[in-house]
């Protein structure tokens, strides 16, 4: 993961995020979220939620899943995914289409593979890597927790009428892993198209890590100055009447300005990141607990951070 692109490709500056540093941040956020959820659930007795004596497993699985969530991401990031799919459509798909089917069964398989082979995706590739290519010998719980999206690459993207359309918006696994995924779902009593509960934590930790990361890296590279970042954010907050974020930005900006010039940039983003992460972890933990029944069933069709569109956190 170290040399894989987060935003800036082939970066030699160790301060700029790669997929490795990003993954370490996500794992840390996931651990924080899991602990916060457990602290709240303990107030009502963990027996009620079936988590008694499982605190460490809950936390460690959340952290582990988040640490390897991007393992399938190719060099050069999402741009590479598009390039790979384009290459496959031009070079491989015609060969598959020209293959003569001797039976209806082979023709049906060919039809499935035509969709599957041109839907390369980092999420689906992660499942392939941990189960086939590198054989990490993970438990069923660990494997299924990495399955962020529940649609096979060979299946059509659902429309808005599907009650699980968010969980199926991107490919989550390839046809080559279909039997294993179904076996795990059957063993763990997870319905088709549904998600493992801890995966919601991993997704929220990933979303939270993006809050300031790209802006921070842009300033580090000299693309933007600290003052430009401040002016852009405050201008947007004013336009959107966003008081929550504006208050945080102003407070941290003034605090950073009190430090000596060389440290203003680092201090601003450190203060800002800590404040935002603390607030957003509390928010997603509350959403997780309030919707724990749907999350336990795996039918909660939202990202935790985006669920309540009326909240100040969603607007921020």
Model-derived segments and spans:
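Sequence-structural signature of the catalytic-core scaffold of metal-dependent phosphohydrolases
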Residues: 1-4, 13, 24, 28-29, ...
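Intrinsic disorder/low-structure terminal segments
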Residues: 7-9, 75, 295, 299
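Short hinge/gating elements
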Residues: 9-15
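Low-complexity, highly charged intrinsically disordered N-terminal segments
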Residues: 20-21
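C-terminal subdomains that position terminal phosphate/3'-OH groups for nucleotidyl transfer/ligation
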Residues: 244-316
